[in-house]
Every structure is written in structure tokens, then in C-alpha cells.
Amino acid sequence: MAAPCGSELPANSPLKIPKMEVLSPASPGDLSDGNPSLSDPSTPRGASPLGPGSAAGSGAAASGGLGLGLGGRGAASSSVSFSPGGGSGGAAAAAAAACRGMSWTPAETNALIAVWGNERLVEARYQQLEGAGTVFGSKAPGPAMYERVSRALAELGYERTPSQCRERIKTLRRCYSRVKEHGVGKRKSSYTFEQLEQVFGQGGWDAQPCQPVLINSSGLYQELESDGSTMEDYSQEDWGNHSQELHGYPTDQELDEMPVSKRTLKIKQESSEEAQKRDTMQNIVQILESVQLKWELFQSWTDFSRLHLSNKLAIFGIGYNTRWKEDIRYHYAEISSQVPLGKRLREYFNSEKPEGRIIMTRVQKMNWKNVYYKFLEITISEARCLELHMEIDWIPIAHSKPTGGNVVQYLLPGGIPKSPGLYAIGYEECIERPLSPDVERHALDPGKEGRVDLETLSAQASLQVEVEPTRIIYCYLGIAEVRTLQQCLFLHFQANAKTFSKEWVGINGFLSQNCIVDPGVSPKSIYIKFVEVERDFLSAGSLVECLEKAIGYPLKFNN
């Protein structure tokens, strides 16, 4: 959890004078939170809220209606400054302020919301039922809960007593309920409805838990104008505008000021990431379909308890059908290579998790009829093999200039691990295809012989074939179990005249033959990739078949 930026303010920061707020020394510790105004943060633990001049301050307030200003956060004792109050109701205002307690700043309120959400998740784990996921009980949080919240706030630099935290939570819950039921408020707030929805949603303590939105280190909410207002005093129209402002959505003016190149780059990055995720999921679906697994209907957690999935790695898919179409379609697919399958499936079939909430909502709204799952158990070495294919980039192998006539030497890159693992060798394939119809039509049309333009002539002369984007073809999967990755790759790429042959015999023969080139002709571009795997795991699983299923074609030099 990031510490709020307000905790870094110097002790001599400018003083702010709250409006009509006077604190009485009679109640410095247990202060309620009925005051909705937003002003300076509280004093450090162990120091009097009034500082050295508390007695004078209370006497002056009782006689002349004086206001009190507190010093900057983090000081050992708060400095006190007095300013003339206005009117004859000073004593009444002082008494009312003492009852209400010290007000909460925007940063404090947001930190409290975040801490409260975290503590509710901890409480949920204490109440977890065997084999049933996270379930909240109906018992309201007790004093211990507010003690933990108070300590957590202290770690962030905000000194609040448990009773103050309890009163503030009550106020926030009332604010949330009012906006939830009526959809309207009166004035602005430093927190959004979405934040409160995440920690108070659907009935308060019985709500579904969700990680709260934390304030960022730049003080997103700290810079809001402290106008003494809360969410209760907030109109529906202003609420939407304020929520958009808090979440940082760009306005039309900001979009106009943003350079077009930056906007285009951001869109391209997002679209590239989405395309990569889509391609990865399609690859996983292809693997699941290639092994012809049967869909299983999800009914209860009893099914999973029989399967003993707590310590298994697997490739799994989540599917669904509808009342109109019985065919089962994929909703999601994943390789659970780091987290046990049982834990991942719980997240997708537990309505209190973000993934599970999506599925539950679609079933409740009758978008889906039934939910299904399928999985293929894999070994650790097979999981690393799939990681090698889907997450590790190819490394090109350079070659020297021809020596001794028409022979080139491979130049392996540095940094190849001296440890066991898996490695793959591939080569770049160029696919040629006939000329496009337009070029063929211009070339074969006799009626246009006298008026062929320069573009057509250039196409006929230099583009006899159109080359598609190249792709790298896997041809060999190696297991560095007895030797290290570095030793295995060096053995493959050592150019030896004795191994030269016109017929390719294994991967070494292929690499040796590729070193012999005709004058003016470059050898095939060769690539490698590798991943470290513990030696004890390398002997488990069917690694070659695993990779062949993932890439969709056989490895040429492994058979």
C-alpha cells in the first residue's frame, strides 16, 4: 500500500484555519466523526490535539468564540494559532465541534476506505468455510477490527483512534446507502461511489469483497479543494462529473492538447496487448482441442474435492452454453503453470472473486445457461516447455563471412546459461506466392501494351513474387539434462567439415549443410530460444509431443 503523499509534508507547512471548528481539551482522545467537513489531518498519537496552548485556547473559545488551526502533519506537537471568531455563538460552536470530533482530510478518508477493504478481506479468510470459498458471516465487525484499522492507518502516517475509525465508517456507510437508494446527493466528495461500492456494496458487511482503489503517491485526492463537504451533499449530475475527474478520464480539452502521436501510440500499445492476449488464448484453445477433452458441467465444489486439484498444474478452459444454443463455447483458457489448478478454478467459480463474479452475473441474467470446465494435467517440465514456446523470444544466430571458399561459421550469442533446461532451434521460412491479379492483368492484357505505366513495369521487373511476412519454423527441441544448455548448443553449432553432407542427417547435419553457401547467397537464418529447468523435472512428461501439439506441426529433426 503506497504511503499518502501528505505524510511527506514538512512540519512548517502553512497553517489552515477550519471554519467554526473549536476543539475542547475535555475530549481529546475519543472523538466521534459526525463532522463531515474536510480540513487538516489529526495530531500525532500521544500528543494533545490542542498542543501546548490548549488551556488558553479553550478559555478563549469559551469567552470570545475563537477558531483553532492545527500545524502540519508529522510534527512532534501541533503548533497552535488563533484567529478571531465571528459572532456571539462561539461557545455553542465550540461545544458542537468538540462533540463532532476532529474532521477527516481527503487523504485520510481514502486511506481509511482502502484499509477497511483490506481488513475485510483478512476477516473473510478467518471465516472461510472448508471447500466453499470465501464466505462472509452475518456478524458485524467488533472492536478488534477497528483496532487493526487504527494501527494500519498509523503505519500510513494517520493517527486515528478505533472509535474515530468506527464513527467514520458508520458515516461512510450511511453516505453509500443514501446514494445507493436514492441516486442523489448534495455536494462534492474526495472519494467516489465506486470506492464505497467495493467495500460496502450489497448490504454492507455481507457484501462481496473487492480490493479497494488506493490513492496514488502523487496525492490525487489531496489536491481537491477542502470545502467542508461530503458525498451526502452531492448532486447526481455533479457526482458523475466528479467521479470522472477522480478516475483521471481525459476531458475534451486534454485530448485536444495531447499530441496526436502520443494518442496514436497509446492506442497501438493497447491494441497490441489485446491482440497478444487473444493470440495466446487461441493457442491454448488449440492445445485443448487437439487432445479432445470432454467438457464437465460445474455443479458444486464436491466435484473438485474428488479430483484432488490442490497441487496440480494444468491447461484449463472455462466454457458455457445458452438456452438457444447447446454448443459449448470458450469463455476463457489458461495454462496454470505457476498456481495450482484448484486455486485458479476456485477464482473462476467463486462469486466473490472478480472472475467468478462475471460468470455468476451472466448466469443470473440468463446470458448463459450452464458453465463447464475442462483441463489437461501437465508436468512442471511440460509447463516450462509451453512457456518456452509462448513467452520466450527467438534469438537470431549470426554467422561470419565465408572462409575457405564457401563455408560460414555460426556465432553464438553470449549469456547462454551453464545450467540444465530446454532449448529449441528454428529457421526462417519465406513463403512465395504468385503475382497479384492486378499485376498479372496488366502484364497479360495486350490492349494496354502501349500505355503500361512505370509502376507496372517496376512491378514486373522487380516483384516477380510477393513475399509474405516471414515466420520461424521449429525444427528441433533439445533437452539439456546431462550437459548444460551452453554445452548442448555449442555442440550443435560447431562447424565440422566431417559432418558436411548433401543429405540432412539430424539437426547437426542440417546446421552443417546450412554453412555451405554458393557465392552471393546467404545461408538460412537460424534462431534459438531456451529456458532453464531444474534437472530433476526434465525427465517427466512428453516434451516433444507437448510442443508439437502447441505449434500444430511435427518437429522435423526429433523423429
UniProtKB/Swiss-Prot annotation:
> Which InterPro entries does the entry link to?
MSANTD2 (IPR042792), Myb_DNA-bind_4 (IPR044822)
Residues annotated as domain Myb-like: 103-173
Highest taxon in the source lineage? Eukaryota
Keywords from the UniProt entry: Isopeptide bond, Phosphoprotein, Ubl conjugation
Give the Low complexity compositional bias ranges.
46-61
Q: Where is this region: Disordered?
A: 1-62
Residues recorded as bearing Phosphoserine in the entry: 13, 24, 27, 32, 48, 436
What's one Pfam family here?
Myb_DNA-bind_4
Cross-link Glycyl lysine isopeptide (Lys-Gly) (interchain with G-Cter in SUMO2): residue positions: 268, 343
Q: List the protein's name.
A: Myb/SANT-like DNA-binding domain-containing protein 2
Look up and give the organism this protein is from.
Mus musculus (Mouse)
For this protein's source organism, the top of the classification is: Eukaryota, Metazoa, Chordata, Craniata, Vertebrata
Gene for this protein?
Msantd2
